[in-house]
């Protein structure tokens, strides 16, 4: 048995064939970075994403010959609105890091007691309806929805529970879209995808040779959580990618609300299948690897991300230099959208190595913040952490 796995991340997408032995073969990758036309804005062209998904998938399939099924994992909450009749997006997709809806989140809290973050789908969908030219025949989706739509030649308009639960539009008690949240955001439920289990055949990838069945949809962080073997209460992983996500498996008991909790974390669906829904808790760092990219591409203090370790190891401490990794604001626990990256404690004796080490330590300190917040909100003790990226 072999599965074509399509992974659409924030900075690139890949397709590979995974054998039943766990071996990963025929990896195909394309960089696919979002654009930032102004500070705080993060967007991408969904049609270019469609083309790239089809290219890497076809290349991996050609190398493998055939596969038994297709699985999709994706950056979550990034939002696409398109015309149902034509399949053409109504405008740029809004990336999960986009901050243009900060004021809408503040208003939702003050007027409706809804604790939303701009990195969720809810206010992005509302903003698109107000700002993009469209007719009544439009639909929304996150990246998993879009990829399934593309692979099925438009037959599927679906999302899974793990993606739905981080949109800000999902009711964890009814396991359906929240009519109250949709009404507040001005989104018609007919525009939303059907919510399906993370595991189970949902349709055919008819755009690919052989039309293999699509048998899994799962958000990238939840896929990582399960892949790291975190399937008992308290088991935790942290992923350092473009951003940083700490996820803790909590079990089968649904949270009372999908809103942000007191410590700044969010309830998530870890995964769902025919036997039910399993839950987790997530803490969010809005920028992690982005800070390393900044050191490399913009400040030119290092040659590559890998080079950061070599440079930072040239000194034993930061010599008092402190870095706050807030290039896109601060997430858990404070959720300060106006915060910005800050470098403190610089003296005439500060070297390149001190700054690079301070940036790496700043990311690590934010990781510690997320551990504390997750323990406080989940009531679980995190005894160990599994790390990927």
Residue ranges, per PLM feature:
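A conserved helix-loop-beta module that forms one wall/lid of the active-site cleft
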Residues: 182-200
């Amino acid at each position: 048995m072999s599965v074509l796995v399509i992974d659409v991340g924030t900075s690139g997408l890949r397709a590979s064939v995974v054998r039943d032995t766990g071996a990963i073969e025929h990896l195909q990758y394309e960089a696919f970075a979002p654009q930032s036309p102004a500070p705080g804005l993060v967007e991408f062209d969904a049609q270019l994403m469609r083309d790239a998904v089809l290219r890497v998938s076809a290349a991996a399939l050609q190398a493998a010959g055939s596969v038994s099924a297709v699985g999709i994992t994706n950056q979550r909450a990034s939002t696409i609105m398109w015309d149902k009749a034509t399949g053409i997006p109504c405008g740029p997709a809004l990336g999960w890091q986009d901050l243009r809806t900060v004021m809408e989140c503040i208003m939702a809290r003050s007027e409706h007691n809804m604790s939303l973050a701009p990195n969720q789908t809810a206010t992005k969908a509302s903003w698109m309806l107000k700002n993009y030219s469209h007719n009544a025949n439009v639909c929304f989706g996150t990246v998993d929805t879009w990829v399934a739509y593309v692979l099925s030649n438009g037959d599927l308009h679906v999302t899974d529970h793990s993606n739905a639960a981080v949109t800000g539009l999902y009711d964890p008690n009814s396991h359906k879209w929240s009519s109250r949240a949709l009404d507040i955001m001005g989104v018609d439920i007919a525009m939303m995808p059907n919510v399906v289990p993370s595991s189970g055949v949902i349709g055919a990838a008819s755009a690919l040779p052989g039309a293999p069945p699509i048998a899994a949809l799962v958000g990238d962080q939840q896929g990582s959580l399960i892949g790291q073997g975190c399937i008992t209460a308290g088991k935790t992983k942290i992923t350092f990618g473009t951003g940083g996500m700490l996820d803790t498996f909590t079990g089968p008991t649904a949270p009372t609300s999908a809103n942000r909790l007191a410590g700044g974390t969010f309830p998530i669906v870890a995964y769902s299948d025919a036997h039910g829904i399993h839950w987790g808790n997530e803490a969010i760092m809005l920028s992690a690897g982005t800070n390393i990219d900044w050191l490399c591409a913009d400040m030119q203090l290092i040659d590559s991300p890998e080079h950061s370790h070599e440079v930072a190891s040239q000194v034993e401490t930061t010599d008092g230099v402190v870095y706050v990794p807030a290039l896109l604001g601060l997430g858990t626990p404070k959720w300060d959208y106006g915060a910005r990256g800050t470098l403190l404690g610089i003296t005439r004796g500060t070297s390149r190595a001190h700054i690079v080490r301070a940036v790496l330590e700043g990311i690590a300190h934010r990781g510690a913040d997320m551990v504390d917040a997750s323990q406080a909100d989940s009531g679980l003790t995190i005894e160990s952490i599994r790390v990927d990226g």
